[in-house]
Amino acid sequence: MPLRIIFMGTPEFSVPTLLALAGAGHEIAAVYTQPPRPGGRRGLDLQKSPVHQAAERLDIPVLTPVNFKEAADRRTFRNFGADAAVVVAYGLLLPEEILSGTRCGCYNGHASLLPRWRGAAPIQRAIMAGDRETGMMVMKMDKGLDTGPVALARSVPIHATMTAGELHDRLSEVGAKLMTEAMARLEAGELPLTPQPQEGVVYAAKISKEETRIDFSRPAAEVHNHIRGLSPFPGAWFELDIAGRRERIKVLGSEISQGEGAPGQVLDGSLAIACGEGAVRLTRLQRAGGKALPAADFLRGTPIVASAGIG
């Protein structure tokens, strides 16, 4: 028989898994997602999460607790009588009472090959570190941070020009298929669980505002990885003097280039920038409040002369 599932997720990354599970015939008893957040131009409108909106389109009940500190919220969760909970980028810590609140437990779709990149930002960290491979894993959750036993895994290559946004979309697609397979195996009583290795643990800390600034004193390969690992969000950036004002410019695309100079020096008219070793060419940029533009279009509106310094 199809499983009775509670789905827990918030961003766009989670939506394909919700749709896949519903499409596979499982009964989605309820969807848990983070509460609506202020949005719009002035922050006056409350915006529902992508998962919230998807659940409403499917006529699935939606719950948005701020946390699970209230006994009533924990009791409501248990009273759904679910076979399992599926958690994909929910964004809230789950207490023991929730982890054990379904017949078979909680299963998390995590965007890395655990135990590498446990934590909040596995996609960005993998690219920023220059990894050539990552993947999706389904694990049974325990009280640790991404420490539970692994049920299924799929590896995904990270190509040299792939951005975090592109990898995000690929892993979201892979994760939906993998979780659907995991729930089918759980339904059949054939879902394996393997403890994670003790070696190779690396944590994917949340991206801080301070580290998004580009440090051109680093080698070109590291600068390139930094840029694509933060593209499109939150975006790596440098500062530039424009009409006497210091302005922050986001860089959403780059490639390794040739050339030497002082770190941050503009080497030519197509935005090759000297790094600590080698150079990177900036291929897509965005001014504050403006659109992301290819470098040639950006330069037509914002000239940056060769030999200038940026940072």
UniProtKB/Swiss-Prot annotation:
It is an enzyme of class 2 (transferase). CDD domains: FMT_core_Met-tRNA-FMT_N (cd08646), Met_tRNA_FMT_C (cd08704). InterPro entries: Fmt, Formyl_trans_C, Formyl_trans_C_sf, Formyl_transf_N, Formyl_transf_N_sf, Formyl_transferase-like_C_sf, GART_AS, Met-tRNA-FMT_C. GO terms for molecular function: methionyl-tRNA formyltransferase activity. Disulfide bonds: none annotated. The keyword Chaperone does not apply. This is Methionyl-tRNA formyltransferase. GO terms for cellular component: cytosol. Attaches a formyl group to the free amino group of methionyl-tRNA(fMet). The formyl group appears to play a dual role in the initiator identity of N-formylmethionyl-tRNA by promoting its recognition by IF2 and preventing the misappropriation of this tRNA by the elongation apparatus. Belongs to the Fmt family. (6S)-5,6,7,8-tetrahydrofolate binds at S112, L113, L114, P115. It holds the Pfam family Formyl_trans_N. It catalyses: L-methionyl-tRNA(fMet) + (6R)-10-formyltetrahydrofolate = N-formyl-L-methionyl-tRNA(fMet) + (6S)-5,6,7,8-tetrahydrofolate + H(+). Its EC number is 2.1.2.9. Keywords: Protein biosynthesis, Transferase.
